[in-house]
């Protein structure tokens, strides 16, 4: 399970955090009493009030002045309810971020026209990564803070409140100091993480600091204590301006105007990636949204766009090769694992190595935190099960089929001419086996004729109750005439069912189909092989394709048009583009011996599996001239098998000589024997014998049409299809998205093991821990409730986006009321409650997400790069929208929208100063002695983390002092 491991420094910091509000609360009680005695009138400004105001949704808990015990009870209820609401917001934000991931993963197809006129298609993402991070991604991670500010203003008659703005500033401080401090510390010792897109980081950091400086300017400089309409609107419009500036920096549009850009397809899912290059020498066109754009003429995207098609193909091939390499390594590392487990491991490894968005890490952190399990491992396991199930499709008749199916066991049968009879098996599957089923059969001529080649047969087969298999026999007529192989057909027809329910025992034809019918195959083909010829020897086909993963390839050599006598057929392999000697296949040669009446033999060749994604190599398998085994050779072979005789290759008196070996290790004088032929070769032949010899010559074995088989070794179909499926399924939007409500409800009620993300492999399935069960049961209400949110599959994620943000708004309204009532119950001001408790609660999922991103990602962008952008968006959207609405409302009524500059202006100024220190330290850490913003030597990590935690504690400390008038603000 993912845990937030904190150093002693962090532990001390959080203990101080809990102590500070209580300290000031106690001090304020004393000062409040003193001021009341001295008729002070500033207690409302400088102390927390114990009198609560009606919330946007929640009413006031009466009576307003409870006893000390009741205050503790009320504070506990408010605090627990607030924490539970934070859990709910985290879970619905998980759905919200899933929809954002799906939306920003949308692609469009473009057509590339090559110089030779050929066209090819590829896909590009619609959303720019930087734009999506600053808009939808930032909105997703900061939605509670933004909505809290808007709801607070709108819910309190468009008057300014402390909770929303203070939450935004407090959340920004927590993100800037605590989250970055944690990310610096959790990177393993000696490792570093750098920000990849430094230009974008500079722009967003500058805008983040400017955003809070701008708040100070409009509150304390331009129009102190009043927010005018143009100030609110300009604050809001800074948001799209910030996005444009970040996009310009990302695209290098201002600084690299005249640097020609070259575009190639990325390794992940055919995405187009930009890199700088020389002016193109050839003309390339690209079609987007149905229009062909000539990059040489139109200077597409402020640079000459060159879509290097060859390089794109190479990168696609490289991605597949990488996937194939991973599968091969896993197979070698885990030879005992099944294909499902190997696919799961490969899928998880590829997804783990893939660059991930901020949304993904936020979703992953929330699900691990709430007992929903590791989404990467769950997705990998699901895909593996689906992939294996695709290979295990069973086409047989289901046993629970209500209709009985009657069919032949196989569609083709073979027999020799001298076999006497051929047996055909009829099967019965499914339906009610207590019924009696009748089925008619009859033979039909093919190339074989009834009466001369086989016996015409017809009849009825009866399946009694419980019987599932029957056998019928057809007589085969033998003759001594050389003839081609012939065939005839056997048909099934007229299925009838008998049951006790029917009056006459036989059901009517129009009722039979509901109980029994013919299955497939209902016709069998019987081939009769002639046995009067020694045979024609051939391969089944001239070319065969085999998978390199086949291992031992077996090739059939057929003996047609006769099967009389013993025949030896030599064979050998011949190299083509495939090499023998164990490189692509093992060289094979030998002889096949067909016994009398034997019609099929197999040749085995070992194919070497080197698991290439694409392979197309050939070799040949050739059979030589067949020869009849003469009587002497036949006897020698028999003696060799039984008694250890070998052929010497010598002749005595015209007869072959055989040597019997008594012992191989200690030879003794051998015995030489001769076997005389039954006939004398020198004796003249009679006319009858001459005719017999002529007939015998006609019946000698010969080669058929296909004597040289071309074997094409291809990549393993299973291996290739597995790689292709993994390539298609490595889209993170598919991992975090959902397709149906059923899937969402199953996921909501299922508790999964939250395994450590440090694991490189899935390993064996683990059971959920006690912590997983506790968190699951604490959050199961929210999980089931938010399972009603539309799946991300609908409207390309927009349906889920809209419903989720409405849900977040409702929960945020409850959180605002609970936080305000909690603060007033214990005497804390809203500004302090917001900075400490609400900001912490809304930032916990981001803390987990950044921790995971810091340890898993190659760069620091996903962990801290979005912090600065998110802070700027919080101000421009959260405060800009809320204050614009309120300023317009008051201006329409002829009033001014007044905002007290004191606490907020002080907090903003303090945060801005500390933020400069934070960014300066991060940039200094890029020096070679440390190597990056995150990680580095242990001493440097500790010093940096301690400094950032100290900055945050100082921010909380001074903000609280100012809020309670212990120091003077602005």
From Swiss-Prot:
GO cellular component: axon; plasma membrane; postsynapse; sarcolemma
Residues engaged in binding Ca(2+) 4: 453, 479, 483, 486
Membrane topology designation: Multi-pass membrane protein
Cellular localisation: Cell membrane
Residue positions binding Ca(2+) 6: 584, 610-612
Entry protein name: Sodium/calcium exchanger 1
Underlying gene: SLC8A1
Glycosylation sites: 41, 157
UniProt keyword DNA repair, yes or no: no
Regulation: Activated by micromolar levels of Ca(2+).
Chief location: membrane
Spans of repeat Alpha-: 138-178, 839-875
Residue spans, topological domain Extracellular: 33-71, 155-167, 223-228, 819-821, 893-903, 963-970
NCBIfam families the UniProt entry points to: caca
Binding positions (Ca(2+) 2): 417, 478-479, 531-532
SMART domains found in the cross-reference section: Calx_beta (SM00237)
Residues in compartment: Cytoplasmic: 93-133, 189-201, 250-797, 843-871, 925-941
Stretches the record annotates as Putative calmodulin-binding region: 251-270
UniProt: Ca(2+) 1 binding residues: 417, 453, 479, 483
GO annotation terms (biological process): calcium ion import across plasma membrane; calcium ion transmembrane transport; cell communication; sodium ion transmembrane transport
Chain ranges of the Calx-beta domain: 393-493, 524-624
Family indicated by similarity: Belongs to the Ca(2+):cation antiporter (CaCA) (TC 2.A.19) family. SLC8 subfamily.
UniProt entry tagged with the keyword Ubl conjugation: no
Keyword annotations from UniProtKB, A to Z: Antiport, Calcium, Calcium transport, Calmodulin-binding, Cell membrane, Glycoprotein, Ion transport, Membrane, Metal-binding, Phosphoprotein, Repeat, Signal, Sodium, Sodium transport, Transmembrane, Transmembrane helix, Transport
Binding residues annotated for Ca(2+) 5, in chain numbering: 548, 610, 612, 715
């Amino acid at each position: 399970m993912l845990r937030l491991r904190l150093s002693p420094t962090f532990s001390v910091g959080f203990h101080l955090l809990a102590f500070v509000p209580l300290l000031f609360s106690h001090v304020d009680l004393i000062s409040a009493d003193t001021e009341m005695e001295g008729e002070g009138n500033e207690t409302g400004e400088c102390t927390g009030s114990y009198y609560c105001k009606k919330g946007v949704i929640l009413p006031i808990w009466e009576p307003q002045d409870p006893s000390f015990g009741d205050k503790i009870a009320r504070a506990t209820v408010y605090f627990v309810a607030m924490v539970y609401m934070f859990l709910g917001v985290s879970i619905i934000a998980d759905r919200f971020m899933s929809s954002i991931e799906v939306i920003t993963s949308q692609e469009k197809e473009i057509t590339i026209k090559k110089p030779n006129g050929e066209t090819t298609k590829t896909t590009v993402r619609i959303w720019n990564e930087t734009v999506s991070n600053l808009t939808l991604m930032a909105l997703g991670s900061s939605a509670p803070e933004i909505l809290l500010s808007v709801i607070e203003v709108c819910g309190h008659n468009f008057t300014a409140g402390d909770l929303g703005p203070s939450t935004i500033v407090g959340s920004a401080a927590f993100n800037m100091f605590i989250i970055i401090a944690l990310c610096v510390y959790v990177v393993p010792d000696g490792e570093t993480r750098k920000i990849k897109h430094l230009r974008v980081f500079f722009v967003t950091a500058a805008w983040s600091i400017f955003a809070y400086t701008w708040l100070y300017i409009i509150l304390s400089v331009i129009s102190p204590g009043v927010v005018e309409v143009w100030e609110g609107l300009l604050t809001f419009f800074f948001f799209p301006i910030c996005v444009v500036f970040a996009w310009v920096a990302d695209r290098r549009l201002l600084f690299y105007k005249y640097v020609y850009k070259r575009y190639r397809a990325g390794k992940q899912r055919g995405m187009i990636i930009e890199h700088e290059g020389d002016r193109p020498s050839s003309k390339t066109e690209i079609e987007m949204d149905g229009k062909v754009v000539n990059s040489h003429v139109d200077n597409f995207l402020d640079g000459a766009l060159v879509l290097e098609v060859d390089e794109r193909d190479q990168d696609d091939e490289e991605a597949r090769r990488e996937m194939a390499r991973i599968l091969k390594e896993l197979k070698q590392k885990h030879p005992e694992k099944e294909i499902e487990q190997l696919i799961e491991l490969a899928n998880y490894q590829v997804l783990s190595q893939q660059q991930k968005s901020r949304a993904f890490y936020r979703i992953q952190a929330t699900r691990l935190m709430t007992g929903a399990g590791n989404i990467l491992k769950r997705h990998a396991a699901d895909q593996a099960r689906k992939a294996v199930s695709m290979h295990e499709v069973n086409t047989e008749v289901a046993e629970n089929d209500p209709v009985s199916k009657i069919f032949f066991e196989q569609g083709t049968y073979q027999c020799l001419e001298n076999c006497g009879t051929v047996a055909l098996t009829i099967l019965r599957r499914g339906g009610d086996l207590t019924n009696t089923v009748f089925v008619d059969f009859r033979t039909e001529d093919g190339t074989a004729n009834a009466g001369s080649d086989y016996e015409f047969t017809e009849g009825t087969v009866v399946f009694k109750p419980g019987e599932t298999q029957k056998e019928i026999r057809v007589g085969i007529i033998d003759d001594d005439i050389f003839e081609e192989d012939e065939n005839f057909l056997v048909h099934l027809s007229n299925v009838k069912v008998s049951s006790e329910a029917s009056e006459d025992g036989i059901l009517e034809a129009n009722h039979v189909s509901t109980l029994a019918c013919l299955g497939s195959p209902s016709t069998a083909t019987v081939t009769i092989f002639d046995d009067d010829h020694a045979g024609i020897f051939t391969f089944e086909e001239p070319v065969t394709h085999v998978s390199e993963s086949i291992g031992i390839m077996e090739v059939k050599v057929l003996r047609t048009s006769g099967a009389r006598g013993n025949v030896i057929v030599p064979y050998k392999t011949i190299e083509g583009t495939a090499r023998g000697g164990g490189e692509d296949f093992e060289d094979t040669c030998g002889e096949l011996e067909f016994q009398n009446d034997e019609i099929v033999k197999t040749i085995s060749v070992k194919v070497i599996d080197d698991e290439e994604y694409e392979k197309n190599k050939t070799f040949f398998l050739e059979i030589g001239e067949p020869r009849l085994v003469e009587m002497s050779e036949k006897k020698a072979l028999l003696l060799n098998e039984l008694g250890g005789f070998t052929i010497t290759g010598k002749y005595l008196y015209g007869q072959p000589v055989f040597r019997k070996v008594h012992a191989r290790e200690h030879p003794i004088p051998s015995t030489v024997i001769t076997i005389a032929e039954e006939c004398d070769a020198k004796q003249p032949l009679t006319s009858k014998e001459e005719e017999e010899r002529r007939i015998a010559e006609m019946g000698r074995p010969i080669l058929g049409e296909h004597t040289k088989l071309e074997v094409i070794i291809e990549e393993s179909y299973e291996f290739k299809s597995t790689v292709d499926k993994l390539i298609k399924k490595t889209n993170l939007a598919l991992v975090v998205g959902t397709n149906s409500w059923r899937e969402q409800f199953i996921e909501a009620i299922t508790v999964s093991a939250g395994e450590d993300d440090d694991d490189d492999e899935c390993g064996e399935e683990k059971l959920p821990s006690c912590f997983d069960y506790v968190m699951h049961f604490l959050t199961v209400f929210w999980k089931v409730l938010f399972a009603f949110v539309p799946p991300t599959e609908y409207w390309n994620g927009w349906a889920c986006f809209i419903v989720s943000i409405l849900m977040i708004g409702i929960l945020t309204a409850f959180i605002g009321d609970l936080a305000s009532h909690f603060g007033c119950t214990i005497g804390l001001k809203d500004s302090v409650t917001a900075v400490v408790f609400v900001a912490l609660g809304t930032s916990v999922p981001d803390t987990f997400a950044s921790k995971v991103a810091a340890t898993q990602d190659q760069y620091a962008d996903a962990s801290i790069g979005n912090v600065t952008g998110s802070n700027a968006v919080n101000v421009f959207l959260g405060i800009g929208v809320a204050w614009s609405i309120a300023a317009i409302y008051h201006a329409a009524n002829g009033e001014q929208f007044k905002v007290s500059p004191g606490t907020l202006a002080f907090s903003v100024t303090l945060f801005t100063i500390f933020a400069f220190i934070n960014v300066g330290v991060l940039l200094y850490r890029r020096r070679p002695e440390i190597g990056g913003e995150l990680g580095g030597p242990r001493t440097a990590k500790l010093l940096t983390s301690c400094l950032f935690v100290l900055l945050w504690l100082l921010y909380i400390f001074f903000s609280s002092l100012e809020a309670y008038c212990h120091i003077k603000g602005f």
